[in-house]
Amino acid sequence: MQREATLGRSVSVRGPGMHTGRVARVTIAPAPAGHGIRFAVPGAGPAVPATTVPWIASRMCTALALADGRKLRTIEHLMAALSASVIDNAAITVEGTEIPILDGSASRWCGLIDSAGRVVQERPREVLRIRAPFQVDGMHGFLRAEPAEAFAVDVSTDRLPGFGVLRWAGPIDPASFRTEIARSRSFGNASLIWRTLLKTRLARTLLPAGTRDRLWARSFDAQTVRGDGPEPTLAQPEHSRPIGPDTDARMHPRDREPLLRGARPGRVAILLGGRVLGGARFPDEPVRHKILDLVGDLALAGRPILGRIVANCPTHALTFAFLTELMRHPECWEVVTLAEAGPGNAATT
């Protein structure tokens, strides 16, 4: 029987947030079996679970509503690293209101988790097994869950100017996540990021004379290194279930909040047409980062998902809607515990 796991010791990291630009310190500590992943902000009330219940709409990130009315923003990269590392229980303390962006990827989070070690606990590990296809669409994309013997994804996007269709498919496990997904970085449009830097009066400090020209000279053309194989095609939607009006109402931010104040080279992959300024880590880095975000957002199901996720142009809000509506259709899923030998032997709980 597979069992839950937590960290072997506490680990901490400090850094600025992508959107607020403010420095926060995050400590990830071991937690008892059955605890789940919970976030606490000193002075903001009780810790909140990393589930769809406290999820609150926030532009360009995933956020949780704190008891004092504030938001804890940009949890998705840390959640992806915990999920892909098979960590079920952790007590996370955040001295601030946004998780540090670090280098824009989940690589450093994975390194911290690996350095802490993984401790198996006594409680059987439950997973949410997909029994029947389930799909929602909206916001120019769709998400679909299909029955499968392991967690896998098939994600495509065609909404990045100059990149054409980008698509990546494969299983997600601790090894594949680290080698194929974790290093992919958050990305943003060059003009939007330059404008933000200018507005915050940081451009002269961060981008001294000649820097922009050097970045252009080192630009990486994703189209030219994709290879001579066939051009990828978009994943295709099937029968979709409607998003309920109450779910739809929660998908849209209702307040103004800081955006991209901490974005700069070294923390984000800056896109210009079909190029990644300064070089890309993968030819299809943007869609791989879409998968990173998707893995983190799907972790808000509260249990690991056993199934294949097919998505086109997924967003944080659409993934929230997908999980919320999926929970309303229990005929499409079941909660099971899995034998150590693999997913083929399961018991319904």
Where do the language-model regions lie?
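Short acidic-hydrophobic catalytic motif
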Residues: 1-349
